[in-house]
Every structure is written in structure tokens, then in C-alpha cells.
Amino acid sequence: NEVDFDFWRDFRKAVRSEKEDAYILGEIWHDSMPWLRGDQFDAVMNYPFLTAILEMFAKNTITPTQFAEKMTKVYHMYPHTVNMAAFNLIGSHDTPRILTECANNLDKIKQIFTILLTFTGTPCLYYGDEIGLDGEQDPGCRKCMPWEDENQDLELRKHVKSLINLRKEHKVLANEGDLLFVAHDPDVVMYKRESSDSLAYVCINLGKQSKSISLEEWKNA
């Protein structure tokens, strides 16, 4: 982001002249709006999304209510057209594996993937996270992909595949629906996705006991 704006404008024109649907992704750690006005980048890496995920599920430093507040802020940082292309990530080649961050807690990993794949934006899966690959900082997070089924967490892989299929089948879970967090229980992260013709509810139970959620409360939210 130290490169002049005019360079990126010329870069975009050159790239799009070769491939009209090329996806131009930038890496910026602060307010990215100056690069996201339609003449430079299509999206940037959504680090505020990752930060909120880690604070909630890995570090346990925020409550579900605070998580909802942070994610709502993430959602409203940019216009909806920008959010639809947002590069939502839960790990990369520069960070410890999400499984390692969460102390190998697979229940938390499933919950994180549920949020990732029902949130507005472009979900990014770093290779191996979907089959339970672990690892600390580089080089631990860059180990080779284990292709054999016996070396993969097949239950986690099945969970991720089912979420991907849900996102494909129900566009309201992708980018056609608005997103609204609703707080009715201190142990549950809840939000709804709503479009002109569809409505979906996402509930993440962070407690140890089962929960009952009233749809009437959702409708009145």
C-alpha cells in the first residue's frame, strides 16, 4: 500500500484488458476504502474478520455480545458491493494454523467454518485447514498437504463440504442476503441472513448445554 494510487489504476486497466473478470486482491492492514472505489482493488484481505474470530474462539478475550459488535462493525466498514468481494480468511501462510490457534478444539473449528461459510464475502480456505492440518508459525503452517484419507480428519472435511454445498444452494447464505446479528443469549452467537425472498438463521452455541431458540424473538429483532 506504499505504491502510488495512479500505479494501481493503470495496473487494473492493464490486467482487465487481458482478463475482464480478474480478481485483484490487496493486502492492507488499516482502512482500505481509498483502494476500494472501483478503480484499483476488487478486495483486500479481511484481517478485522480474522481478528474477531481469533479473539472469540482462540483467545477467549471477548464475549459473544462483543463478538457480534465487532463483526457488525466489520460488516459496516465498507459498502455492500465491497463486502461481497471481501477476502474473508481464518488463516494463511503467515499465521499459525487455526486448529493450533484453537488448541486442537475441533468443535470450535467447526463453529468457525460455519461463520466463515455463512458470512457475506468471499470465504478463503487455506489448504489443509479443512482436513485438520495443524502447525505453528512458518514453517510449521506451511507443511505439505496430506492427501491420504487416513491422514485427514474426515468428519471435519465432511462438515466443511456440507457448508460449502449449503452456501451454493442457498444464495441468501452467500452474498444475496443482508446480515444482522441478534443477541438473545450470552452463550450464543446469532445472526440472520435475509434477502427479498429468503430468510436463514445461524446460531452458534458456545456453551456446554443445549439451547432452545425462539423464532418469534428473531422475527421481532
Language-model-detected regions and their locations in the chain:
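Active-site and adjacent substrate-binding regions of carbohydrate-active enzymes
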Residues: N1-A221
